[in-house]
Design a protein with these regions (language model features):
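Catalytic centers of nucleases
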Residues: 1-32
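Solvent-exposed, well-ordered amphipathic alpha-helical segments
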Residues: 5-11, 32-39, 65-70
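Mid-chain, well-packed structural core segment of small domains
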Residues: 20-50
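Domain-level recognition of nuclease-like catalytic cores that cleave nucleotide substrates
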Residues: 38-70
């Protein structure tokens, strides 16, 4: 199951750790994502801003969809 809900079409794996193996975290998100959900990892370190990792293909899909709204 996703760690965070409320963003339709996006599967969120959430990590708050000082050391993160991002490839393992993405693999977990990809394995847990339902069909048609974009696997993502939202991650942060203490006293640092949140970052989001996703595949380039999924990022381009979001970018193109957002461009249609502008």
């Amino acid at each position: 199951d996703a760690d965070v809900i409320g963003l339709p079409g996006i599967h969120i794996e959430c990590k708050w750790v000082e050391r993160l193996n991002i490839r393992e975290a993405m693999e977990q998100s990809m394995n847990d994502a339902k069909e048609k959900e974009m696997p993502t990892v939202f991650h942060k370190k203490n006293r640092q801003p949140w970052l989001v990792t996703m595949t380039m293909d999924d990022w381009m899909k979001l970018y193109k969809a957002a461009g249609k709204l502008l």
